[in-house]
Amino acid sequence: MTMKKSFKLSRVAYSISIAIPLSFFSLQLMASDDNYNNIIFPEIEAPSNCDEVAILGKCKKYDGTDPLDTLYSSAGDSTRLYKIENSFGFYVDKKQPSNGNVIIINSPGSLGGVIRGISTNWLEGVSFNDNRIFINLNGQELKWNHTNNGPKIGDGGWISAAAATAGKQLSNNSVYIKNTIFSESGSIFGAYANSASSSYYPPFSQSTITGNTVILDNVTMKPNTSYEPGWGAIVAGAYLFSPTPTFDDSAKSESIDMSNNSVYIKKSNLALDSIAGAFVYTDADSGSFKSNNNLTFIDSSTVNTGDNVYNRLYSASAPNSQDNVLSIQNSTLNISTDKKYYSIRAVYSADKTAENNRLNISNTTINTLNENNVSAKNVDITGGYSYETSRNNKVILDNSVLGRKVTSVNGGISNGYYEKSQIVADNNLVILNKTNMHNDLSVKGGYIHTVTPDKTQ
């Protein structure tokens, strides 16, 4: 039986469609001027068998003794199209839609490869929707047994509910992990989309990547020790890798909707590089491309991060990014910036517009681990960052502690480095309450950076 529940949270409304035990939900988020301390963490009872969950497609369960699979790790980059043994999940050949699949994992057993709700190396115009992964190991450890060919981010990561290349629709795919220990950090995606230039595939266009979710509840992810740490590890509701093809500079990723994706993390201890509701890697000037109403929510957790090319914790990033929320509460962030800068932003970088985005940090300590290193890089906290218009963005810091390498807090930034026609930082706001600050901290409501002296509002 399907039930629909709506939660109204102190002038912030989150409409969540839930099927019991889980048909996962598409998140509809409406920004307001109030705080975001009352976001409800989804309490999901994961099924233990396939007959306990409504299934639209196929279902597979692994309890430690079931047969494992050999799967392609890649979501499309032909330079890394290799197979990974001891994997579990579904794979389809080119141009086949696959919707409503369910993966249930109750024991680590010999599982050590990739986990896929569904994957393919070429989707082209069809859909991967409503695929779900449930993992509950009841405190046991899953040990990745990869070789040096272990999957990188560009291959769809370790766990993806849906992973594809050049797909037209990847919606409402979800990963739910509870009471689980991972032997090292690895990427986890609700939906992963790849149009890598090294494969000479066309860019994404007229694509929908919406309503995808990752939920981590009492999860431990240990640091990497067995391979080069520079590979990076990301947890994202949705991830899009779509650079401009090297053979055609005029081809742009456009007409993309990457909205309503989410990450929920509670009572977890994670070593990784980045967390985002919607993580986007694409070139600038990508045409019509929006990333709205995405959410990243971290509660009662410890995140150990920093010194990687993916140094960022945010909600969304796209040329047009509106009404996105990053909320961190009752948590500890341990950030290393010995080599790289780090950013905590509701919107990481918008080529055009960052508007009505919210960043709330409460009852949280941000430790910057390299404070005594004079060459250590800085950490910024920003509501919305754009290269044109940054408007109506808000940062709230409440009862929190900032390390000395946190050197700037900004409601909104408009970076005029590329000298675009409209460089606007308007009506952005920072609210500080009972927050431990230091003498090197810069606080600005609105901030315009140009080749001429900066303008501060």
PLM segments and residue spans:
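Gram-negative bacterial Sec-dependent N-terminal signal peptides
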Residues: 2-31
